[in-house]
Amino acid sequence: MRTSPLRTRTRSLAVAAALAACLTTATTATAQEQEPDSPSTAAECALPGRTGWTDEGHDTDRAQFQRATGTHRVLTLFVDFPDAPATDSTDAYAAHLAPAADWMRTASYGRSRLDIATPYRQWIRMPSDSTSYGFDRGITFETHERYVRDAVAAADPFVDFSRYDMVYIVPAKAARAISFSPTYLYDPATPGITADGTRLKWAVTFGQDMWRWGYKVADHETGHTFGLPDLYAFTGETHRYVSGWDLMGNIAGPAPQYLGWHSWKLGWIRDSQVACLPASGTRTVRLTPVERPGGTKIAVIRTGETTAYVAESRRAEHNDRSACSTGVLIYKVDSATQTGDGPVHVINANPDTTPPSGCAPLDLAAFAPGQSFTDPATGIHIDVRRGGPSGDTVRMGKP
């Protein structure tokens, strides 16, 4: 979750209509299907952002969001409160979040590194009680910024903020009122927060839910500073859109590796690793698993100005070692859909299968060889032809 001035916009409370899909057995291509004369460039399948905030568009505003590549210098501050003083050491808190750095490095193929620093391992006393900071769902940007400003001011005598790109603010366990973990994204149009001559642009303010979600909550919230939206639903059934596929959905899901679409948006995979079909025709693509570096990562069929279908190969390894299903993951992307309203919909290849313990129905969504997806609204189809340890081969077509 993020807070921003834009959160005051009116949000639709209607639940998105169910995505119509046909799941069939793949058939041999007909004689009328034609491969394009020359492969399309990936740019032809890149979608523009239309929400003015975190979304699935490729034109991420780098004045608002930080780049997702390179080293990110993260300052960790440990805070307690007059009404909730800490009685334990900060060591366990630092150790709890430390694995987030390795997870991000693996997820990004080494292209994004979190240098999580803890130069001051003492508790920093906040000026106000924990109950005064309004940590409820729907917290306003102004209220959230006050919390961050107070933490920065209290820590300023002890650390040099000019040495860091972003801040993690970690509360004592005694501060039950600091319940959840929103991300602070600065507003360039306001004076904001400055310390040591440096404008503080990004901060993750952890809450007590960090102990329930585990260290990956840091990777999820840091993803918002890169411009990624929430893939879980803000209303209704929380995980109906993507379930445990992608960390921006269910943080504790069994297959949290970022979607290949997100890796492309963030610059972790190159245009040469994207197979694009923007116009009519067919194309056969050999996909390598998104959990590994190298090879073609996503096959994209563009269906409109802001919409596309994406196919990618998933395997139970690395960050996805607990995946409930493997094969080809197919999903619809809409870059005009706001965060929390379902900008990504995963297509379930096995809707009638009962999931085992620890898995949700949509966690079994991966397509196997011989299965096919057709969208009745657009006529596009994706057939899974082959699969094996090295990846999957799909044939995608557009009338």
What is each of the regions a protein language model found here?
Residues E33-M210, D219, Q371-F373, G379-R386:
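Zn2+-dependent metallopeptidase catalytic core
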Residues T71, Y241-S243, S325:
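Short, solvent-exposed loop/turn segments at the edges of secondary structure
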Residues D80-D83, K173, A252, R315, ...:
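Non-catalytic surface loops within mature trypsin-like serine protease
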Residues M1-Q32:
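Secretory targeting and sorting signals
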Residues F161, M166-Y168, A174-D320:
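Extracellular hydrolytic enzyme modules, especially secreted metalloproteases
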Residues A100, T106-Y109, R113-L114, T238-K265, ...:
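N-terminal short leaders/motifs
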